[in-house]
Every structure is written in C-alpha cells, then in structure tokens.
C-alpha cells in the first residue's frame, strides 16, 4: 500500500478523496483488526487518538487499540446525561485497561443549556441536531485540535446500522485520517473477543439495551424494533460524531 499524504488528500473534493483511498481500503479489507491498527500506526501520521462512547461493546476497541498502542489518548465526549451505569463502566474500564482517558464537555453545563434552550432532545430532529452539535461535535472537534490528532481510531461496525453499512476501514473526517479496525465484525466476533480477553459488555446489556447513549434519548430494545429505533426516538442513528 502506498504512502498517503493527509494535506494533499484534504485539498481534494470528498468524492476524489474516496477514490484516492480505494486501493488502500481494498487491501485493508483483507487484514485482521489488529493488522489494521498496526498498519495505521506505521503508515499514518501522529498524533493518534481513539474515541469511545463507552457503549455496549466499547471494551473491544478500547482493549484492541490500547494493547497495540498503550497510552493512546482515549477521547470521551461527556454530555452530563449518561446513565449512572455508563459512568461506572468508564471508571471500571479506565482502571482495568489503564486507559489514558481525555474527557471533553460542552462549554455550557447541562442545566445552563436547559435554561437557555429548553430540552433540545424533545424538539424534533432540529433540536436533537443542535443538542448533538453542542455536546458531541464541538467537544470532539476541540479534542482533535488540542490533542493535535492526525489519525483517529473508532469502534464503529457496519452491522450496527444502515448508516454505517458501507463505511470503509479508512477515511478522512474532520481533516484527519479515521480508521475503523473492527468495521466488518459481526456480533459473534465481538462476543468471542470479549470472552477471549475476559472483558464485559456494558452493564445495561443484561437489561435489554442494544445501544446506550444519553438517558433521555436511549430506549430499551423491544421485539420488532430495529437497533436504530433504540436511539433518538428512531429519528436519527448518529449523534453527529461520525457524520460528515
């Protein structure tokens, strides 16, 4: 696979960037998740970061990447509305895996946001998008800038939703390389990895949650529901971090 120039690629239109990365992605599809991480660390520029929402299967990518690159900064965008079990899970995994956790938050506290805007998540798609911009997108952009990131690892998988079904292993987002090492893993592979390494699902998994975000926009799975319907009242799947 040829060397990639981030600055040159950023100057291209999005369609041309996709085409420029096509050959590399074809080769990356043939590699294991561990090999993809190793390739990225060898061939893509630093600084390197890993983002995590500490969701249902978060332990997989946290363990996988941190094993190969110990002390990699792990970015969490904390909305202040996560489940108590999520905060406990964050503490547990940070201690168990010795994570270099970097927490980023909005400039306005949750209470101040509610005073200013009301409950944005109850204001339809437009309100949800504004909420996500304030609490997810802006803090992530700030994290990438402050940590001088040029290569960003994330734990997205194609099986999780229609919006992720065609994502490549390697892309450029927010001006940096984005690497998705476990993009082609199915639920069985995730389960086997967790079992092999003595890792746990998020505590709410046992209560019927397939996906976990904020308390006010996360629903327990019910028979007949698609996984996408458990988040943002079925209006959206993505929180904004992995769009654009």
From Swiss-Prot:
Gene Ontology biological process terms from the UniProt entry: hydrogen sulfide biosynthetic process; sulfate assimilation, phosphoadenylyl sulfate reduction by phosphoadenylyl-sulfate reductase (thioredoxin)
Function: Catalyzes the formation of sulfite from phosphoadenosine 5'-phosphosulfate (PAPS) using thioredoxin as an electron donor.
Cell compartments where the protein resides: Cytoplasm
Keyword Cytoplasm: yes
Pathway: Sulfur metabolism; hydrogen sulfide biosynthesis; sulfite from sulfate: step 3/3
Family affiliation: Belongs to the PAPS reductase family. CysH subfamily.
Pfam families per UniProt: PAPS_reduct
MF GO annotations: phosphoadenylyl-sulfate reductase (thioredoxin) activity
Any coiled-coil regions, as ranges: none
Keyword Ribosomal protein: no
Swiss-Prot/TrEMBL catalytic activity: [thioredoxin]-disulfide + sulfite + adenosine 3',5'-bisphosphate + 2 H(+) = [thioredoxin]-dithiol + 3'-phosphoadenylyl sulfate
The enzyme's E.C. designation: 1.8.4.8
Record keywords, A-Z: Cytoplasm, Oxidoreductase
CC annotations in GO: cytoplasm
EC class name: oxidoreductase
Protein name: Phosphoadenosine 5'-phosphosulfate reductase
Chief site of localization: cytoplasm
Annotated active site: 239
InterPro entries the record matches: PAPS/APS_Rdtase, PAPS_reduct_dom, PAPS_reductase_CysH, Rossmann-like_a/b/a_fold
Gene3D superfamilies (UniProt xref): HUPs
């Amino acid at each position: 696979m040829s060397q990639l120039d981030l600055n040159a690629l950023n100057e291209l239109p999005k369609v041309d960037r996709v085409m420029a990365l096509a050959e590399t992605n074809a080769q990356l599809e043939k590699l294991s998740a561990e090999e993809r991480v190793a390739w990225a660390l060898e061939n893509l520029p630093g600084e390197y970061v890993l983002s995590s929402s500490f969701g249902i299967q978060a332990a997989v990518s946290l363990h996988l990447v941190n094993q190969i690159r110990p002390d990699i900064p792990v970015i969490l965008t904390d909305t202040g509305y996560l489940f108590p079990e999520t905060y406990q899970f964050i503490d547990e995994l940070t201690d168990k895996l010795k994570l270099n956790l970097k927490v980023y938050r909005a400039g306005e506290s949750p209470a101040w946001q509610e005073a200013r805007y009301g409950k944005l998540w109850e204001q339809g798609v437009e309100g949800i998008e504004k909420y996500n911009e304030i609490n997810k997108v802006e803090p992530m952009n700030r994290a990438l800038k402050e940590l001088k990131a040029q290569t960003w690892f994330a734990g997205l998988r194609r099986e999780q939703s229609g919006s992720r079904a065609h994502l490549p292993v390697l892309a450029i987002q927010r001006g940096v390389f984005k690497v998705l090492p476990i993009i082609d893993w199915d639920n069985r592979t995730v389960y086997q990895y967790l079992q092999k390494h003595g890792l746990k699902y998020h505590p709410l998994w046992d209560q019927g949650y397939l996906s976990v975000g904020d308390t006010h926009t996360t629903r327990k799975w019910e028979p007949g529901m698609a996984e996408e319907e458990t988040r943002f009242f079925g209006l959206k799947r993505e929180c904004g971090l992995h769009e654009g």
